[in-house]
Amino acid sequence: MRLLSTKLLSANFKDRLIHQGFLLVEFPFIQIKPIPSKINKVHNNIIFTSQNAVRLALNEPNISPKLEGKNYFCVGEKTKLILEKEGHKVVKMSQNASFLADFISKNYINESFSFFCGKQRRPEIEKVLAQNETPLILHEIYDTLYTPKAIESRFDGVLFFSPSAVKSYFKSNTWKAGMHGFCIGNTTAASLSKFTKNYSVAKSPNENQLLLSIHHYYTHDYAQK
């Protein structure tokens, strides 16, 4: 089976796919562009909903010193691991922005938050915290650029890791018969559902679960067609 990944994969994930017999092509359909930011004030509670924001913030000399000793609230297991690897305290990790916003609104009523994010993002954090009058400072530190490419070769499956990658893919491509999509999470799946019903979603937004989703489809669902 031939798979197309819409981003460059980790060496471990790529090796595991190849070991299972998949032929793999990687092409990044989005590019992350840092936005120069002058950060003056950072609250004691910090929100991250993407790995890109974490990596950029931790590697930016103007930002990184201001992040020491804070409480962190994040979306995604990998985001949590990056923060903890750098010695930061993660108070709460949720699987998506809606769950995290709900947790904060119920448990941190009188607290203030700083949200490091991209220009293109889900609205839940801002919407829910505003409804509960929770003070929130936004720090937009990157933008997501589309890098679409027309794919001429035939693939059996396409791996998607963000709604932005879905949008970029369909700027230059259509969904061909017989193809199946594999989504890292529900927000990505919601974007793909506008173009096809042929997709699977990882039970949790991580590489292990995505690999299980791919394996299950091709050993059960696909085999029964």
Task: Give each language-model segment a name.
Residues 1-225:
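Signature of uroporphyrinogen-III synthase
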